[in-house]
Amino acid sequence: MQDGLADAQWYRPAVSPERMQVLMARSNGRAAFHTVLWLALLAGSGALAFQSRGRWWAIPAFAAYGALYGGAADPRWHECGHGTAFKSRWANDVVYTVASFMLLREPTMWRWSHVRHHSDTIIVGRDPEISFPRPFKVRVVLANYLHLLNGPAMLRRMVRHAFGSIDDDARDFVPEDDLPRVVWEARIFVAVLAGVIAWSVLIGSIVPLLFIGLPSFYGVWLLWFFAVTQHGGLREDVLDHRLNTRTVYINPVFRFLYLNMNYHLEHHLFPSVPYHHLPQLHAEIKHHLPPPKTSMFAAYREIVLALRRQHKDPTWELPLPVLPADAPAAVLSSKVTRDVEDPEADAVDIGAADMIETGRIVRLDLNGRTYALCRPTADLYALTDGLCTHGQTHLAEGFLDGCTIECPKHNGRFDVRTGEPLRKPVRIPLATYEIERVGGRLMARLDGRRVPPPPALRTTPSR
C-alpha cells in the first residue's frame, strides 16, 4: 500500500449546510413501508414456492424467493448498517441483524469491515471488500454469482468464530473489545443453521433448507448483479471516489430492490444521506461528477471491457473520466474563525447567540483550535471538539438530530451534551465545553470549567 492512502482525506463537492441538513434527515415511515413491502414479497414468493414444490413452476417461485432473500437483503443490510434507513436506532439494528443472517454475514465483524471500506475505498491492502482483486480471474467472478467460493468460506469462518478462533483478517479491523461479541453472534447463527439442518434430516426433506440457509447461495446472484456495478473495473489506490465508484441509472423496480444504491458514488461521498434522498443528492451535485452510466447494460459493457483487459494486464485502467475543475476539497459547514484574547479566562465570549440557527451546527475556529457549536433547540447550546474521535472528520459537516451529532464519514454518533459515544464506530468520548447564553452572547469555558454568568442574565444552560 502506498504511503498516505490509509484513513486519508477524500474529495467531496460543496453543498450548503442548510441543504445537507435536509438531505440527511431520516424517516421511519418511508423505511418501514419499503421494509414491509420487501418482507411481504418475500413471504408471498415463499408461500408460492411452498405450494408449488414438486411442480415445474417451483423453479421460478424459488428463484424469486431466493433473490429477495439472498439478494435484496443486501441493500437493506447496508443502509441499516449505516443507521440511515430508519430514524429509530432499534429498527435499523433489527433489520440489519436479520439481513446479516440472510447473507451469512456476522453482524459486528461486517459492520467494522464496512467502516474500513468507507475509510479506504478500493485501497489495496486496506479495503476488505474489494470484489475484483487484481489480477482478475473470470472463474472467481462466475463462481461468486452462486456463492460457490465466498459462501463456504464465510460459513467456515463463522464456525471458527463460534469456537472462539478469530482470524487475523478480522482482528485487523475489529476492535479487541468487540471480539467476544463476534464469537457470540457466530454461535447464534451457527446454532440456527444447525437447527435447520437437523430439521431437514429429521423429516427427510431438503425443504426447510430451501427456505433458510440455501437461499443465501441460490439467491445471491441478484446481489452480485447489482454490486459489480459499484466499483468493478475502476481505479485502485486513489483518493477520489469519482475515480473508483460509479452511479448507474436503473428502472424503478430495480431501484426498490437495490434501495437506490445505484447512486453509489453519491453514497460514498455523503454516507449520512439516507437512501430515499439519494436521487435528490444526485441532482444537487451531478455537475461535480462524471456522467452516470445510463443503464445496467452500459455499466456492464464498461465492466466487462475493463475486466477482460485487467485479466491480461492488471495495470490496465479505463480512461479517466472528464471531471469538473473545482477544488479538491470543500468546506461544507458554516464556519466562524476568530481569536479570543484569553482562552483560559473564566468565561470566553465566543460570539453572538444568534450566529447559529436552531437545529444547526457551526464550525468554530478559535485561536488555532476547532470546535463544533450546536444548537439542538432554541434554548439549548452545546460546544464540543470539532473532530470526530474515530475518523478525524469535522463534525460540523455532520447531521444534528436533537442532541445527537453524527459524523459524516462513518455515521458514528455522540451526545453533544456529554460527549458520550452513542453509535459505533466511535468509541472514544468527545470533549465537551460548558456554554451558556448571557444576554445576546455565548460564553464558554474552554478549559472545561463551568461558566458563572450573573443570575439575572442566565438562560437555560447546555448541560
Describe the function of each predicted region.
Residues 52-75, 98-108, 216-220, 249-260, ...:
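Membrane-embedded alpha-helical segments that form the functional core of polytopic membrane enzymes
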Residues 402-408, 421-430:
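Short cysteine/histidine-rich metal-coordination sites, predominantly Zn2+-binding motifs
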Residues 1-67, 76, 101-209, 275-346, ...:
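Non-catalytic, topology-defining segments of multipass membrane proteins
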Residues 73-82, 110-122, 226-233, 257-273, ...:
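Histidine-centered catalytic micro-motifs
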Residues 67-77, 106-110, 154-158, 211-239, ...:
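Transmembrane alpha-helical segments that form the membrane-embedded catalytic/substrate-channel core
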Residues 85-104, 126-139, 239-251:
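Juxtamembrane helix-capping/reentrant segments at transmembrane boundaries
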Residues 25, 79-86:
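Transmembrane alpha-helical segments that serve as helix-helix packing and pore/cofactor-lining elements
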